[in-house]
């Protein structure tokens, strides 16, 4: 499971679609509707949020916005849809999910690691996107401006829950 802190516009097609599916799974996990992935480290920051389900809905909305911009069709009805394990409705009633959800802090070191990881993955599977990624990074300016709208950059190293890889 990879829930990127980077802005969705930086993700290639595979990363964007995988992130959408995996965040939908995270939404189910946070509702108590699955047995698996309940202790997955990628969920730590959402569990620490005062409104975890709303935060996941806001995150998914950001992915869907990027999908719309690319002409993809992500089913927004899945965002906040359904009920939790207690039967409570989880419907997302907020038109602008970012207006009422506190931002999640993400250390600059985490963003730097994720960007290096994404570049490594994209280099092997889509060299054309790698070129576009470099152009998008140059256009967006400093790394702090390259986060998903739900996140707020703070000073710091890679998150302790991150399982780092050498590449």
Where do the PLM segments sit?
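Sequence termini and other peripheral, non-core segments
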Residues: 1-16, 22-25, 29-33, 47-167
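Short conserved micro-motifs on helix faces and helix-strand junctions that flank
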Residues: 35-37
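Conserved, mostly hydrophobic/aromatic
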Residues: 40
């Amino acid at each position: 499971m990879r829930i990127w802190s980077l802005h969705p516009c930086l993700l290639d097609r595979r990363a964007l679609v995988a992130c959408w599916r995996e965040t939908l799974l995270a939404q189910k996990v946070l509702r108590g509707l699955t047995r698996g992935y309940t202790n997955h480290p990628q969920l730590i920051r959402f569990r620490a949020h005062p409104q975890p389900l709303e935060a996941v809905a806001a995150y998914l909305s950001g992915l869907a916005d990027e999908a719309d911009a690319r002409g993809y069709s992500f089913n927004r009805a899945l965002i906040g849809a359904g009920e939790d394990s207690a039967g409570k409705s989880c419907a997302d009633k907020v038109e602008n999910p970012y207006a009422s959800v506190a931002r999640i802090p993400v250390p600059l070191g985490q963003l730097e690691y994720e960007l290096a990881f994404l570049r490594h993955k994209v280099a092997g599977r889509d060299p054309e996107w790698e070129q576009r990624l470099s152009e998008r990074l140059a256009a967006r300016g400093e790394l702090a401006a390259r986060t998903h709208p739900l996140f707020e950059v703070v000073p710091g190293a890679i998150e302790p829950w991150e399982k780092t890889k050498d590449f």
